[in-house]
Each structure stands twice: as structure tokens, then as C-alpha cells.
């Protein structure tokens, strides 16, 4: 019997950065996604209707986001809610779907982890921080590792059937791009009865970002995460 190849949706939230370096890191990451994604992977970005979106043509653009944390809670940035992204992705024709931060890079073998998707419900991916790269140097693995033990999760994926049954376990109020939303998802996934895979499969160009822990979005996420043991 021929093994079924999973249909995968890889979603990002494209950011129209004004910072030239951040814009370039995001572009390289998207180009890497295009280069390394097999034919069974759909690349998509979810954005607001008025967003200026400049992605490679292989990405499908869905301007479906409505909830905006700047409007709902007075956040300093107009950031979306992570569950909205997961919910939109789960409505697509797929077996597995997930979200990556838009400046994350993956090698071709990243997608091998989904081969056994019928038995795995959730996937949590950590990153390795590396020095500046081009698409070619990243794919040749000719790069310098700066930090190999980053604790956060820059990518989370789900088996679609599991998510549709269990989505109510997850709080609606967590905001992408603010601290601790990923820690919250890790906790709730870990408390579920599903089968979980955790891997350090992602790469990211290192830059010394300091979280604004007093923003309304950060306070919101930390409060929700702190309420879960």
C-alpha cells in the first residue's frame, strides 16, 4: 500500500517591516521556505485587509484577519491573535497545519517529521540562532551557530482532525509577536491526551531583541500563560 503523503499548510503572518535588516531577514526566510518546501506544502500568509503584503508568488495571501490587538486592548502594535491564524489554517484542505514566525528558516528535511502524521497530534519546534546567511549558505549548512538552545517555540503545528476536536482547550486571547503565547500552547498541549513531537528544527538569524514586557499585549499573554500550571 502506498503511504499517503500529508497535505501541509505552513502559515506565516507577513510583517511590513520599516527596519531594513528585519525586512531582509524575513525575505531570506520566505525564499528559503519556497526553495525547501515540497509540493505537498501550501505556503500562506494571513493578514489584515489593509496590510501591504510583499511575499514570493508561491505564497497565497489571505487578508482574513479581523481581531487587532491594538484596537481590542490598546496594544502598542497591531498584532493578530494566534488562535485566529490556527483556525483559518485549519479550514484549508490539509492534514497538518501550523504557524512559523515569518523570519524562521527550515531545511528540506524539516518536513520529514510529518511523515507519521496520522499518529501525531501536535508538533512544537524550537530554533537555533545563527549568524547572517543567504539562501545558498543556509541550504549548504555553511553557517555559524550563535545560540543553539533557544527556549522558545517559533513553530507549532497540529494534525487538523485533532485541532478541530480540541481547539476549545486553547484560550482565544493570546497575541502573536508578544512573549509567552508559545509557552502557553506548550503547557496546554502537554496537558492534552494527544501524541506530541518536540524538535529543534528551526533556524533564525540572531539579533538581540529585548521584549517590551510592559506592553498591553505582553501583560495580556503573561496573565493568560500564568493562569495555567
Model regions and ranges:
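Short, hydrophobic beta-strand segments that form beta-sheet elements in well-ordered domains
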Residues: 40-49, 121-125
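Short, charged/polar "capping" segments at the starts of alpha-helices
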Residues: 19-22, 49-55, 131-134
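Preference for well-ordered, secondary-structure-rich cores of eukaryotic proteins
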Residues: 13-14, 33, 44-50, 104, ...
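Conserved catalytic core of nucleotide-sugar-dependent glycosyltransferases
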Residues: 75-78, 86, 104-187
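Active-site-proximal specificity loops/subdomain of glycosyltransferases
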Residues: 45-95
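Short loop->beta transition adjacent to catalytic acidic/histidine clusters or analogous donor-positioning motifs
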Residues: 6-8, 31-45
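Short beta-strand-to-loop acidic/aromatic patch adjacent to the donor-nucleotide binding site
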Residues: 94-107
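C-terminal catalytic/acceptor-binding lobe
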Residues: 2-30, 167-229
Amino acid at each position: 500500500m502506498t503511504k499517503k503523503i500529508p497535505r501541509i499548510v505552513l502559515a506565516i503572518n507577513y510583517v511590513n517591516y520599516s527596519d531594513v535588516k528585519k525586512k531582509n531577514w524575513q525575505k531570506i526566510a520566505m525564499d528559503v521556505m519556497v526553495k525547501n518546501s515540497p509540493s505537498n506544502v501550501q505556503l500562506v500568509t494571513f493578514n489584515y485587509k489593509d496590510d501591504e503584503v510583499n511575499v514570493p508568488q508561491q505564497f497565497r495571501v489571505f487578508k482574513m484577519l479581523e481581531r487587532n490587538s491594538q484596537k481590542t486592548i490598546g496594544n502598542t502594535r497591531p498584532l493578530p491573535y494566534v488562535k485566529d491564524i490556527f483556525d483559518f489554517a485549519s479550514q484549508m484542505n490539509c492534514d497538518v497545519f501550523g504557524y512559523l514566525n515569518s523570519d524562521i528558516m527550515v531545511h528540506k528535511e524539516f518536513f520529514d517529521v510529518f511523515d507519521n502524521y496520522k499518529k501525531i497530534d501536535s508538533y512544537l519546534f524550537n530554533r537555533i540562532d545563527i549568524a547572517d546567511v543567504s539562501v545558498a549558505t543556509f541550504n549548504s549548512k555553511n553557517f555559524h551557530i550563535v545560540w543553539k538552545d533557544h527556549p522558545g517555540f517559533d513553530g507549532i503545528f497540529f494534525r487538523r482532525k485533532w485541532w478541530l476536536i480540541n481547539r476549545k482547550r486553547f484560550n482565544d486571547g493570546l497575541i502573536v509577536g508578544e512573549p509567552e503565547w508559545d509557552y502557553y500552547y506548550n503547557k496546554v498541549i502537554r496537558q492534552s491526551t494527544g501524541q506530541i513531537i518536540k524538535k529543534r528544527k528551526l533556524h533564525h538569524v540572531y539579533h538581540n531583541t529585548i521584549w517590551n514586557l510592559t506592553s498591553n499585549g505582553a501583560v495580556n499573554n503573561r496573565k493568560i500563560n500564568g493562569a495555567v500550571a
